[in-house]
Design a protein with these regions (language model features):
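Active-site gating loops and adjacent loop-to-helix segments of metal-dependent hydrolytic enzymes
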Residues: 96-129, 166-185, 243-270, 290-293, ...
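His/Asp/Glu-enriched, well-ordered alpha-helical/loop segment
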Residues: 263-270, 312-400, 413-417
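Hydrophobic faces of well-ordered beta-strands that scaffold small-molecule active sites
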Residues: 86-90, 146-147, 167-170, 206-210, ...
Length: 463
């Protein structure tokens, strides 16, 4: 009887203590929490509490569990808990062109192969299934936010939201008939409707995406920028990617691509500039002063031999530099941002002949908090801090390539792979648990991708 009384007393105390806890919808526990906050705090046995789509607490597991109760607990099993990765530049529907005509120059790839292939194959359904395939691949490697430029971008938005991903999605402006719009007037009308539809959405940020200064007239560039600013949207554009682009701009405009964009009123703190390879000291100063974000795409730049972005100098100038995969066709055949971290660091080291040129901690930042700064979303994502969106990637340390671990950042940048990502949470919702995708029908997506591979080959007379 005495034992029963004691047990009852303990139970009452437990219930009382439990009742005093704050509620959370989800707690991620038993992980090494790499916050990427300004202090770069790491909790060796940490936890993250989530309410709704946002983080309400980050800290030692014992403290979080003492203060919060949650309806759902995700066990990190001693692995890493990171901010979700940010793919700052890609063309996701082009997953369905993966491997189509590699090992050619960018100019030949665009004009001889891809533009004709797009004219014959790209429609809403192509974009729909390409986006589903790209979303599956990105989630599997820990990407929670991506910046896209393509056609039928409203379809990309629908599928991105259905997958539970966060997207900054740009409708392409280009000075020749595109698969979805055959004139600038049609492009403007489509894009304005697109911007209106997605304004205020929790996951989707719609944007105009003038392709580049070599495919868009001054008027097209200015019209796209004006539309973006009317709706307080970002502007996505390729900038100074090729030497020929820089040479032509100097010859035709008397100035560099960066200076030209500034001269015509496009450059600004709302611009996300992909590549930024051919940028000298004056260009870098201008980019920093304007608050323009740059996105480094090492795999792409290496694959098409377009050049090496001066990332250490850009960062030293105060430019926010993120990472992107580009591709996923022709310029890079995968969407694994962890691979880009590894390559970015090593590419900087070898080109500068300096092993200190760009370190592991630098490239992890470029994939997270600096990537968020580059796409002007650092107040919402990029680090595990109270008030930010609950976008997390949980990475296993139970594979041969993951042990032993002496330095967390070096392990992430140089040892771990996208395939080591186990669980992904976006906006407080689990979209992949224990490597199983929860928002996408992966077998069906793979089946459709194979079908598209056959139809694309047939359309180009490759069979």
């Amino acid at each position: 009887m005495k034992n029963i009384r004691i047990l009852g007393f303990v139970l009452i105390l437990s219930i009382g203590a439990f009742g005093q806890k704050e509620s959370a919808d989800l707690i991620v526990a038993h992980g090494i929490v790499v916050t990427m906050n300004p202090e770069r705090t790491i909790y060796q046995d940490g936890a993250v509490a989530v309410r709704g789509d946002s983080i309400v607490a980050v800290g030692p597991r014992a403290e979080i569990e003492a203060k919060y109760q949650a309806s759902q607990v995700v066990d990190a099993h001693g692995g890493l808990v990171l901010p979700g990765f940010i793919n700052g530049h890609t063309h996701v529907p082009m997953t369905l062109f993966r491997g189509l005509h590699d090992d050619v120059t960018l100019n030949d790839w665009l004009y001889k192969y891809i533009f004709p292939a797009e004219a014959k194959n790209v429609n809403e359904e192509f974009v729909r299934w390409g986006t589903r395939l790209g979303a599956a691949e990105q989630i599997r490697s820990g990407v929670t936010t991506f910046v896209d430029m393509y056609y039928f971008e409203d379809v990309v938005a629908e599928e991105t939201k259905a997958a539970g991903m966060r997207g900054v999605l740009g409708e392409t402006f280009i000075d020749f008939p595109a698969p979805d719009n055959k004139s600038e007037a049609a492009m403007l009308a489509y894009t304005e409707k697109f911007l209106k539809k997605w304004q205020g959405d929790a996951l989707i940020q719609a944007a105009p995406a003038p392709h580049s200064i070599y495919t868009c007239s001054k008027k097209t560039l200015q019209d796209a920028a004006a539309l973006a600013r009317k709706y307080h949207a970002p502007i996505l554009i390729h900038v100074a990617e090729m030497k020929k682009e820089w040479e032509d701009s100097e010859k035709q405009n008397g100035m560099s691509p960066v200076q030209y964009l500034n001269e015509i009123g496009v450059l600004g703190p709302d611009v996300i500039a992909a590549h930024c390879i051919f940028v000298d000291a004056s260009d870098r100063k201008l980019l920093a002063e304007k608050g323009t974000g740059c996105v480094h795409n090492p795999s792409s730049n290496m694959m098409i031999a377009s050049g090496v972005a001066p990332v250490p100098e850009e960062r030293a100038a105060g430019i926010a530099v993120g990472l992107g995969t580009d591709g996923p066709a022709g310029s890079n055949n995968d969407l694994d941002l962890m691979e880009e971290m590894d390559l970015a660091a090593k590419l900087a080291k070898i080109t500068k002949m300096n092993p200190l040129a760009l370190g592991a901690k630098d490239v992890v930042a470029m994939a997270t908090i600096d990537g968020a700064r580059a796409i002007h979303m650092e107040k919402e994502i990029g680090s595990l801090e109270v008030g930010k969106k609950a976008d997390l990637a949980l990475i296993s340390l139970d594979e041969p390539n993951a042990v032993p671990m002496y330095d967390v950042y070096a392990q992430i940048a140089y040892s771990l792979k996208g395939s080591d990502v186990e669980t992904v949470i976006i906006g407080g919702k689990v979209v992949m648990r224990d490597r199983k995708l929860l928002t996408l029908d992966e077998p069906k997506i793979l089946e459709k991708a194979r079908e598209y591979g056959k139809s694309v080959k047939a359309s180009l007379g490759m069979e």
